[in-house]
Amino acid sequence: MTTGIRVPTLGESVTEATIGKWFKKLGEAVAVDEPLVELETDKVTVEVPSPVMGKLTEIIAKEGDIVEVNAVLGFVESGAAGISQSFSPSATSIPEAPSELEQSPSSSATPSGTMPPAPSAAKLMAENNIAKSDISGSGKRGQILKEDVLGALAQGTKASTSVATLTASSSSAAPIQEMREERVRMTKLRQTIARRLKDAQNTAAMLTTFNEVDMSAVMDLRKRYKDLFEKKHGVKLGFMGFFTKAVCHALKEFPTVNAEIDGTDIVYKNYVNAGIAVGTDKGLVVPVVRDADQMSLAEIEKEISRLGRLARDGKLAVSDMQGGTFTITNGGVYGSLMSTPILNAPQSGILGMHAIKERAMVVGGQIIICPMMYLALSYDHRIVDGQEAVTFLVRVKESLEDPERLVLDL
């Protein structure tokens, strides 16, 4: 029985995908739910599994083809016949070991009675492109010694060999020149990232304001309770949970930063869906922690951990990345000291975290060493005034420098 492999439903507003790659070749056996083909959409990468056990008998859509939802990608022949045929000895060619006469000259023995070059001589010959036939060995049974190679170099063997090498390298210059460039088609995800970032720049009146935060209090709190926190909640206590809580706290006071423009209207969101930017091998994705303002610190950390794992494994669903109202990105994990993050349209704000660096700070009239981080808030100046943006960032700073405020809701 033959079963068709079809493009699954890819989520709201997604109607087509690009064939990324086939994991199986024609004639190969497949198991139930084993990934057959990878589909790339403008939001996620999806693996299509085999619905039955059998053998892949036909591939209709090739790599790079654009296919619509429910389109047939190929066929799998199910049943014992398909499996036994794919594993039968006659279907698999086993290469025979080469006979002694078919072995390459490099593996053949040296002429009878002749010793191979000494290791130091062989190394010197290889470095100077000198063949054994160009040198007469003075060692026992004609072995080439290091002194023989040095003597040949002094007599000009190197020069004649260099001419031959130069001629050979000139003939291969053209292929090498062609290999200096490579043209690769962008993936659907990369095309979407490029388009959305450029749209954000062209549409929003984007501006960035900066501040710095002393991370001493958060780092001390984390150091004291991280083991107990992980033991109780089953997840590590990171910095992102504190930042998410601080953002949710500040957004209550400044709802415009959590709003968006729709035509001539401003849409205020009475909830916080925090987008957490995650870097993957295929590009940046922003999964969403829904109703983060209603979550505890432990719940936020668990959800961030879950979404981050899905993102790195390429298993995020489209729904996992929809509906965000504010984004947090952490360039500090890559060593960034300061940046101007680009808005994730249609959102009106994005917070950029950066690397923590010890710096000399004046505190209470004294110079002390503090672990400092630069914060950057990019915002849409069309609806967020400068005073709101600056004060919003100050509130985030205050919450992080005094994390007890987050617990007491102050």
UniProtKB/Swiss-Prot annotation:
Binds 1 lipoyl cofactor covalently. Residues 101-113 have a biased composition (Polar residues). Residues 86-120 are annotated as: Disordered. Keywords: Acyltransferase, Lipoyl, Transferase, Tricarboxylic acid cycle. The modification N6-lipoyllysine is found at K43. Residues 116-153 form the Peripheral subunit-binding (PSBD) domain. It is an enzyme of class 2 (transferase). SUPFAM superfamilies: CoA-dependent acyltransferases (SSF52777), Peripheral subunit-binding domain of 2-oxo acid dehydrogenase complex (SSF47005), Single hybrid motif (SSF51230). GO terms for biological process: L-lysine catabolic process to acetyl-CoA via saccharopine; tricarboxylic acid cycle. Its EC number is 2.3.1.61. Residues 2-77 form the Lipoyl-binding domain. CDD domains: lipoyl_domain. GO terms for cellular component: cytosol; oxoglutarate dehydrogenase complex. It comes from the Bacteria. Its cofactor is (R)-lipoate. The active site is at H381, D385. Pathway: Amino-acid degradation; L-lysine degradation via saccharopine pathway; glutaryl-CoA from L-lysine: step 6/6. GO terms for molecular function: dihydrolipoyllysine-residue succinyltransferase activity. InterPro entries: 2-oxoA_DH_lipoyl-BS, 2-oxoacid_dehydrogenase, 2-oxoacid_DH_actylTfrase, Biotin_lipoyl, CAT-like_dom_sf, E3-bd_dom_sf, PSBD, Single_hybrid_motif. E2 component of the 2-oxoglutarate dehydrogenase (OGDH) complex which catalyzes the second step in the conversion of 2-oxoglutarate to succinyl-CoA and CO(2). Forms a 24-polypeptide structural core with octahedral symmetry. Part of the 2-oxoglutarate dehydrogenase (OGDH) complex composed of E1 (2-oxoglutarate dehydrogenase), E2 (dihydrolipoamide succinyltransferase) and E3 (dihydrolipoamide dehydrogenase); the complex contains multiple copies of the three enzymatic components (E1, E2 and E3). Belongs to the 2-oxoacid dehydrogenase family. This is Dihydrolipoyllysine-residue succinyltransferase component of 2-oxoglutarate dehydrogenase complex.
